[in-house]
Structures are given as structure tokens and as C-alpha cells.
């Protein structure tokens, strides 16, 4: 293992997408998924919900390490209804049917523990999906992609063909808003871009 491969951050998530996004900005991580209760509180606003879960994941994930620890959570929101991961086929089809032809919000919370204590923020991105036909929704479910995705779709996967427009952070919809994440990591002393040779 080279020094640039040595983890500088603990990621309190099993999401391969979040790990890949962090790798894209040169941050090597060790993965320690945090298993927490993700039930929304009564009348909890979506932004407060995802930020609370991100903070709790970072707190749980930080146990037993001196590394800064990142927690994150994403929710798809229609009105004030929070859509998490679908429970089953029927739930996924109901979610995709509700999102069909709408502009909805994808709200992502991030939190990082470290020398500066617990730092957190959230990002709201507006996504417009075209009208989806019932046979498309069924075929998409059969692809297996919706199973572990908030709102039952993955913007970086097969569902990319459903997306008419994005207003905000594309990486946040994938799983981690890189601009805001980089700011929090820098404040906690985490180096970005790994150890890259200087440009002559």
C-alpha cells in the first residue's frame, strides 16, 4: 500500500457510489458502515432528516478510530413526502409512478467528524423526470437497479434516460455533493487529490 492509498478518512457507508466519488477527488477511505434507525421523526423536514441521519452515521462510524469520519444520507422528496429505499417491487413501482413527469427534490446530508468536532450541511438538487410508461417502470424494476436506491432510481445508471433536467449538484444525486464535501473535509484536515506530483 502506497502512502496515497493509506486511508485518510473513514466512510460510514457501504455505498460503492460514495466510495467512488471520494476516490475521484483523491481521498482513500476505510469503510465502516453505520447501522442506524432511519425512521423519520414526526413532522421532520427533509433537510433536517438527512442531516440528522448523516450526523448519526458519522458519530456511530467514528467509534474506535482516530480518523475523520464521514456520514451521508440521501432522500428523494415529493412535496413533503420522503422517499427512501423501496421495500419491495410494489413500493418501487409506486415511487417511480409518483415521480413520473415531476420535478422533485433530492436532498443529501453530509457530516464529518474530526478535529473541528462535528461539521454538517445538506444540499438540495431539483430533478425533472419525463413521463414514464408502466412497462418502462416494470422493466426498470426487473433490471435490479432500484432495489437499494432512494426514490427507486439511480441517476448514474439506467435511469439516466428518464432525466430531463437537473438543477444543482449531479454528484449529490449520485450520493455525495463533492463541492460541499470537499469543504468539510478540508476543514477537518483531510487532504484532497492524494499525493500527486507537482506540475512542472
Swiss-Prot record:
Q: What is this protein called?
A: dTTP/UTP pyrophosphatase
Entry's SUPFAM superfamilies?
ITPase-like
Task: Give the protein family.
Answer: Belongs to the Maf family. YhdE subfamily.
Active site location: 73 (proton acceptor)
Which top EC class is given?
Answer: hydrolase
The main place the protein resides is cytoplasm
Matching Pfam families: Maf
Recorded GO molecular functions are: dTTP diphosphatase activity; UTP diphosphatase activity
Tell me which InterPro entries the record gives.
ITPase-like_fam (IPR029001), Maf-like (IPR003697)
Record's function text? Nucleoside triphosphate pyrophosphatase that hydrolyzes dTTP and UTP. May have a dual role in cell division arrest and in preventing the incorporation of modified nucleotides into cellular nucleic acids.
According to its record, what are the GO cellular component terms? cytoplasm
Enumerate the cofactors the protein uses.
Answer: a divalent metal cation
User: What top-level branch of life does the organism fall under?
Assistant: Bacteria
